[in-house]
Amino acid sequence: MSEQSPRDPVAASENRKPSFRFDADIFKLCTRYLEENNYHGLALIARQKGLPPFLRLRIWPILLKHHPFVLNPFLQPDNDVLNKPKHDSDQDDRAEGQLNDEDIRFNIKKDLKKYVQRLKYNSSPDINEIEMEMLEVLEKAIFKFVKKWGKIIKYDQAITWIALGLAEWLPPIENTHWVLIGRDVSSSDNLYITNIMDEYSTYIENVPDLEDYLNDVIASPQMKFSDVFERLVLVLLHSPENRTRSPSSKVNKTTLPLNGGTIEDRVSFFIYCLRKLLPELSDYFQEEQILNKFGSNDDEWLIWWLKWCGSKVWSRMDRGRIWDMILGWRLQNPKKSTAYYQDKLKLTKHQLEKLGPDVFWSVSQHDEETVDERGEPDEFKKSDSFKDLLHGLSMANISASSSNTNSPSESTSPLLTPTRRSSSSSTSLSEGIDDMNIPFSRLDPHIELVFISLALLKSKEGTLVELDQHEIRQFLSRLPTKSYNYTTRYQKYKQMKMEKEKEEDNGNGSVSSEASNSDGGSQIITNDNANSRRYDFMDNVVNEAGELWRKWFWSEAVDNE
């Protein structure tokens, strides 16, 4: 993003508007699901396309309420909690809790103050009444969580940063539109809060009656911020139960993608995949002593990425898109038929085509005649070792589902199969029902995050290889946003192209949208100003993560021959 003076109200206002584009049909589907409180449909859109940012304040609480990790929570206990000797009486526990309360509150306030100082560039910033009230809500929510779950995980500054990340999209003060502004932009009046509706005003103005609809959404009853925050932490920090925590235990690469693992497992898996998928960057990291002595504070950026799901270190926009995926993560219940979900979702084939397959799809061991995207035979299906690897993943998935009825892992459709649908344009739900495969999640969400993190590194590889050790760690600890301004030259090219297309279409195009020819006449509504066009490449990063997953999967198949 181009640098603008925080004292220039015009520049700051323009700079503050984030890039956002969304298919009009999917947006209508999203609002329909929201009105119906259809959490199945909202989860589907969240994981496939991401959510309209200005609707997260209402949709995230719904997704969290019904998330499998909230219905059946499990947090990986801290090592010092695991090794802590049991007290002989409850009195010792109460005494320790009383002693820690003041310290916990002090630490929470201190970490909240760091956020304010970071945005206001002042060690003693002035705080207005609304900002003060927001900080009080955050402090109470964090303290409430620590008091409830403190015997499993102790307070860490990252818990406060998760609350701050939530407050960047969910107004802490009920029935208001005030959210934290984030670190990507500066405020002309030195505020660290913003009206989320003003941020997306260009988009909202392009959709008839949307402003009134959003005002009704804000005015309606909402879940308390503290309750949403607790559920969010349970999802982001979820860990599978009954894992062997011995330091000498090896990561099982055939079960980890589906069952997930501890943060130690995921870090080891990340480094392994980095060496295999991005060898040149991995070699450069090794030269610069990056990730060579993991466990110290030198490379704590990776813990922020993988354990704390990008809190603090990722930009507000990028992190919001990834949290959409995590909150929308759902496995298909093996006890429910395809017809059950189709009845719940009421999707047409055209809508399913727009939503696309699960990002982390792969081939199925059950398909005898698997073809690639060009319709040609898929050669690597001939590898018995590939089938063995896939069979191992299948068995791990079935085992996980049988041990956890609240978050079933087995799918009634072939495991790890890309969604392939008929090219028919029929929209009848009664026709071709077997072809309408609804895209459910396949991998554990924290393993998805591993591949997303690798894709982020790949997108920044050209920059990283030009930096030294200190600069690399600083860069990865404050990753720039993927949304950037188009160059003037490209703006002129785009304008000429749009004018030419408009002439060819005899002026039939929509003024408030960008036509997407590849989507068969889709209408794409944008939040970008015509004179300051930007584009958010986070969807490209997500898609690249899927490609890296398949590349890793194929590589493992070849290596096991």
From Swiss-Prot:
Xref: SMART domains: TBC
Predominant location category: cytoplasm
Localization per record: Cytoplasm
One Gene Ontology cellular component annotation held by this UniProt entry: cytoplasm
Keywords annotated in UniProt: Cytoplasm
Composition bias type Low complexity, residue spans: 399-430
InterPro entries: Rab-GAP-TBC_dom (IPR000195), Rab-GAP_TBC_sf (IPR035969)
Residues covered by the Rab-GAP TBC domain: 50-330
Compositionally skewed regions (Polar residues) per UniProt: 507-529
Cystine connections: none
PROSITE patterns in the record: TBC_RABGAP
Cytoplasm is among the record's keywords: yes
Superkingdom as given in the UniProt entry: Eukaryota
Residues covered by region (Disordered): 399-434, 498-529
Family as reported in the entry's similarity comment: Belongs to the OCA5 family.
Protein name (Swiss-Prot/TrEMBL): Oxidant-induced cell-cycle arrest protein 5
Species assigned in the record: Meyerozyma guilliermondii (strain ATCC 6260 / CBS 566 / DSM 6381 / JCM 1539 / NBRC 10279 / NRRL Y-324)
Gene: OCA5
